[in-house]
Every structure is written in C-alpha cells, then in structure tokens.
Amino acid sequence: MAAELAMGAELPSSPLAIEYVNDFDLMKFEVKKEPPEAERFCHRLPPGSLSSTPLSTPCSSVPSSPSFCAPSPGTGGGAGGGGSAAQAGGAPGPPSGGPGTVGGASGKAVLEDLYWMSGYQHHLNPEALNLTPEDAVEALIGSGHHGAHHGAHHPAAAAAYEAFRGQSFAGGGGADDMGAGHHHGAHHTAHHHHSAHHHHHHHHHHGGSGHHGGGAGHGGGGAGHHVRLEERFSDDQLVSMSVRELNRQLRGFSKEEVIRLKQKRRTLKNRGYAQSCRFKRVQQRHILESEKCQLQSQVEQLKLEVGRLAKERDLYKEKYEKLAGRGGPGGAGGAGFPREPSPAQAGPGAAKGAPDFFL
C-alpha cells in the first residue's frame, strides 16, 4: 500500500508534463456511465491516488486520471502525508518536520496506510463488498510494515479497535480519531489492531468448531434416543398391545416420538387388517370354487343317470308295444293261446289270470 502511494507521489511535476496533460483531449473517448451512488463515492477519492486497490470496486475498476494539484513530493518530508490526511478525513494532520516524525521511513509508511484507510472507508463500502472491519484491517496491516508486537490484550489497543469498528459501521470521520495523536502512538495502535484481530479470529474459530461439535453430538444423541424408542417395541408387540398399555410404556418420551410410534402402530394395524381381509377373501374364493367343482360333477352324474333312465324307458316302451301288438289278435281268435301278461299288469293281474287259464 505504501509502495502504491509512493508511486503516486513520484509522478512527474514538470511544467511541460502538466501542460501536456491539460491540453490532452479526453472528449473523444466514451465515458463509462456510473450510477449516482457510485459517482458520489468516486468523488470522495483523495486527490493524487491511482485507485489501484487490491479489492475491485465499480470505481476502482477504471483508474482515475492523476491530479497534479497536490503539492509536489519535494516540498517536505511529511507535507504530502499531512495534506492527504487533511483532504481525506477533514482533520489537519501533524505539522511536517515536527517531533511526531519518529521511525523514519517505516513510520511514514504506516501513517500513509492509516490515512489511506481512513480516507477510503467510504469508497470501499463494506456493506456492498460483504466485508467486515476486521477484513479491512487485516488487508491493510498485513500488506504493510510489521513491527514489534506489544501484546494483544492491551486496554488502549482494545479501545482503539472498538473506535475503529464504530467509525467503519457508521461511515463517519476518517482521521479525526486515528490521525490526531502522534506517529508513534498510531504505529503501536496499528500493530495492536493486527494482534487483537488475529486473537479474535482464533478464538472465534475455536468457539465455532466447539459449537458445531456440540451440535453434532446432540444430534447423534437424539438419533440414538429415537432408534432406542423405535427398537424398544417390535411390530407384533405394537399390534397386540392395548392402547392403555402402550400409553403407560411411552411415558417420559417426547411428543413427536410418541406420535411417530402411534402412527407406526396404526399403519401396522391397518396393514394387518388389510392382509387378513385379503386372506379371507382368497380362502372364501377357494371354498366356493371347490363347491362349484363338486356341484358341476354332481350335475354331470345326474345327467348321465337321466340318460340311462331314458334309454331304459325306451326299451320298456318298445317291449310293451310289441306285446300289445301280439296280444290283440290272440284275444280275438279264442282261448287257444294264453294271454301273456304285459309288464304293466305284472303282479296281482298275473295271479288273477292263472285260475282263468286252468278253468
């Protein structure tokens, strides 16, 4: 980050280059239209920056033209930093060359990072980028200068960290709180931010894993309890057990498990009733089919008996007709031939005819 600002500060400041840039015609290029909200954020860029941030935003995707209205880097050691801080955050920076310039180039680099962060917090728009203040601090401090750490649990560092969070979420003041102190305090505050941020993330990570582990254990225990309740009663026991006995056995269990078990019992009973009805229907059908076969065989036997009796009847009828034809002329001729009794007159008629024959 400091290297980018240094590169922006080393732009040519000769009058010839400034005149060339001012005479350059930009109207022949098409202008990319941006929404009003994006334009409002783009106008808040500090002059002299190239907007080449590692995080791509609608404004930073197209680098803005450099402005040479800022004071040249040769005017003083800390004038550039103080001027940019005054324009970005609205608060005057420390005077250049004063006792605040401690640490040489390293302190200046850290100050430039802090001023860049405070001036760009409106442009980054963490709500649109789904970023948190912790991510912004880590991106800025992690890519800059790393000094000696003075402890993660320092009260002043925690207070400054909370103040930075409030500023980032409220979208207000940039360098009022962070650039008002001397350089050495800002340097220590930045490193305290870094260490406290890492400690906070480490603690949050372990707490989240513990929470997930506890949730998994609780889910496993609930599944085991559910399996134990399901395996406690077999299907035959559920079907044969009375409602009163089942309610007595289910005391102490949750309502959802009791409802699930009773639904299973109702399903088993309905299934058993349907199976018994199906079995009874099949059994009755087999019985009726066997009776039908027996009746059909009896009908066939009766038909055969009827045919046999009809044939016997025809034979007797034919014999009777023969006897009747032969007995008619014998009766008319006299008593030379005894009358042969017909089959219909057998019995008492025959007993009557015997004395007549001998008489």
UniProtKB/Swiss-Prot annotation:
Keywords: Activator, DNA-binding, Isopeptide bond, Nucleus, Phosphoprotein, Transcription, Transcription regulation, Ubl conjugation. Residues 74-84, 210-224, 325-336 have a biased composition (Gly residues). Residues 260-285 are annotated as: Basic motif. Forms homodimers. Interacts with NEUROD1 and PDX1. May interact with MAFB, FOS, JUN and PCAF. The keyword Transcription regulation applies. This is Transcription factor MafA. The gene is Mafa. Residues 181-209 have a biased composition (Basic residues). Its main location: nucleus. The keyword Chloroplast does not apply. One of its GO terms (cellular component) is nucleus.
